[in-house]
């Protein structure tokens, strides 16, 4: 099948590995950070580290926006659901993110909060239309890939005149996250030679947002 078999071509993979081996300097260590949790999963699943030269190391990065969601944001969402009595909705993986004191949105639901799982931002907007007597809050999360969908429902809610729909915005921008990693604890102190950026995000934002990062931290 087109574009499937090519990704599973052992000969092609070995050729790429050999090309990498020819490029690296034997006496120098290399550290590359994959930014996305999907990359980390693929590297582990397919044993890609075994194909790389011994002096090339992959460093696991921040992962997905859900993985790095600050505890304070989860606490805020739980407080809205438990104390303010709103309909708090978000994607399924957000409901399991741990908050302070061992809490989570899923546990808040078990305590009586109206927490609902949705598959899209549009589902959250539909809930607001179906329950005009309730305040519906959508916990929005994701990289630049999901931000447009959140923006669209905000525009749609305004066009419909909905007063009971709001968004708790927890979207994350990729380039600032990269800068945060590379600047900790001080600019240039992190032993990383390159970053493997998230593919879906890069399709959305293009290469220009990365240019400043590449120029500033180039070795």
Please provide the spans of the model-predicted regions.
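Phosphate/pyrophosphate-binding betaalpha-module
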Residues: 139, 143-209
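Metallocofactor- and cofactor-centric catalytic cores in central/energy metabolism, strongly enriched
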Residues: 1-133, 147, 158-160, 166-168, ...
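Conserved anion/nucleotide-ligand pocket segment
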Residues: 213-219
